[in-house]
From Swiss-Prot:
Disulfide bonds: none annotated. InterPro entries: UPF0352, YejL_sf. This is UPF0352 protein Ent638_2783. Belongs to the UPF0352 family. Pfam families: DUF1414.
Length: 75
């Protein structure tokens, strides 16, 4: 069953585009981009999620990330 979001596709795409533009503008290599985005996720969890829920949120995020990564050999 498809998941429904409380956020519009347009809003999500706008934010994604803005974040990608910042990384592209700074010619950020992939490893640094992943490091910065990972640190951002960690900071969001640590500052915006109740301590009792942090591990569950992090696990859910990691599982969603793994599920969304393509096994396609092209890059």
């Amino acid at each position: 069953m498809p998941q429904h979001s409380r956020y519009s596709d347009e809003h999500v795409e706008q934010l994604l585009s803005e974040l990608a533009n910042v990384l592209e503008k700074n010619k950020t290599p992939t490893d640094l981009s992943l490091m910065v985005l990972g640190n951002m996720v960690t900071n969001l969890i640590n500052t915006s999620v109740a301590p009792a829920q942090r591990q569950a949120i992090a696990k859910s995020f990691a599982q969603a990330l793994q599920s969304s990564v393509s096994n396609d050999q092209a890059h």
